[in-house]
């Protein structure tokens, strides 16, 4: 089973970001280290702007009239490539790597959507926060298996 080790402080920062972004999805980058096969250590988070916009939606061909709501930051997120590149460069200087992405699901469960699955990268952790009526209600981590399906990833609290 895949494991991600996270401090309570970082989990709290992720939940706070999710609550502040409500009713929109928040997103950010998980920086850390690979401790062993299928074990990651989260060292810091980098909150990012949700860069989802009409152009992004066009690129994902989501503009059917019955899916208008899915083209907003209330139901979709993306991180600008520049933010990912900057995080990668800063991490390299500190012997850290991008180990995953976090985002929120406003008024939905902390379970990945099909869109989340299709856009996910193998080897990354995906922490999802369910925010119900402006309060973080649940937080779970996921990763892809070899068949590109999400499987639950155990979160171990570290000090």
Enumerate the predicted regions with their spans.
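Residue-level "edge-of-site" marker
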Residues: 104
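Conserved beta-strand-loop surface patch within small alpha/beta domains used
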Residues: 1-98, 107-159
